[in-house]
Amino acid sequence: SNQWQYTINNPRTFFSVPAGETILKIAILFRSGNGNLKQANTDGSDMYIPVYTTTIATKFSVPAFQPTFIPVPEPISKQVGDNINLTAIANSTAENMKIYLNGTVIQNANNVNTLSANPTLSTPGNQTIVAEATLTGTTRTDTLRFFVASAPVVAPLPAGVRDGINYEPGNTSVVLVLNAPGKNRVSVIGDFPGSNWIEQTNYVMNKTPDNNYWWLRITGLTPGQEYSFQYLVDGTLKVGEPYAEKILDPFNDGFITASTYPGIKPYPTGLTTGNVSILQTNAPAYNWTVTNFNRPDKRNLVIYEMLLRDFVAAHDWKTIRDTLSYLQRLGVNAIQLMPFNEFEGNESWGYNPAYFLAP
């Protein structure tokens, strides 16, 4: 009951694929009978079934993988001393199957198409588990990678730091501070030296004694270079820095033209998901050219509320500056900008802000 099955005996015939074209995957999604419900991956993408053309292939069936275009395992949250259930399957009876943990064989069997293991994870850090199947001289593998955490270091916040990005003298280091009470582990992932968007032991944040704050000092930064990063909370939740002054948006940055914002840092596609924060030591300072500005009397204000994107087609500050004389001729002596900090989506009046300090 409540289980449905559909069999495709020959994908090439079923989908009318020409003989010279290689079939790599079948894209699928499921809908309820009335079409109201949809089952897909957590990122909303269709699910993909790999099509194996070789005589032998293998993959992990436990732990479960999300069938994204490049399959990713369901979140694995393990600590030193935990066990992990592993099951590898093959599409044919293999002459030999093996399971490796960090390069060491932990299970081995002949003439099987299923192999299981339940190793104890004894060392912290990145773990690599490989399933291997061999038949008539051909060997195929599947690889599973995840992070095993040790107990976080408990240490008070360094003197003088506050929530967010704290730039230190010398322009080669920062202290990141995140308020995340009740969490078990927080790590920093990004394009910092040695990180490459993978959870690493030396990027696990310290926890304050009151369990409210997490902090990490990152050194070896190049002055003036932009670095992108996220916080990885409990090994599953990726969040940007709430106090960041600049972010990368995977869904909307592509619509920003070079004339509006030249040289925008590329989003790390394929390495992470969600909004990404930016930090930059020794960032160029803004040079104020008007130092004697006097505000109009607040009792005599004539305010024009302006949405930058709608007011001028170029939706940039330079064009607005060239248009100020028009507003002055109308008698306007003050402009109230509609929210121009980061907000959800790319076309909005800005009343659904996402990052209050990122213009």
Go through the PLM ranges and name each one.
Residues N111-N126:
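Solvent-exposed segments in extracellular or luminal domains encompassing
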Residues T22-I28, G125-I129, Q225-Y227:
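Exposed beta-strand face motif in extracellular beta-rich ectodomains
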Residues R145-V186, G240-N300:
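Basic K/R-rich, polyanion-interacting modules in nucleoproteins and related proteins
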Residues S1-G20, G33-D43, G170, V175-E226, ...:
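Aromatic-rich carbohydrate-binding modules that target alpha-glucans
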Residues Y52-Q79:
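Short, compositionally biased P/S/T/A/G/V-rich stretches that sit at domain boundaries
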Residues I278-A334:
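An acidic-aromatic substrate-binding cleft motif
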Residues V302, F343-P359:
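Aromatic- and acidic-residue-enriched carbohydrate-binding clefts of CAZyme catalytic domains
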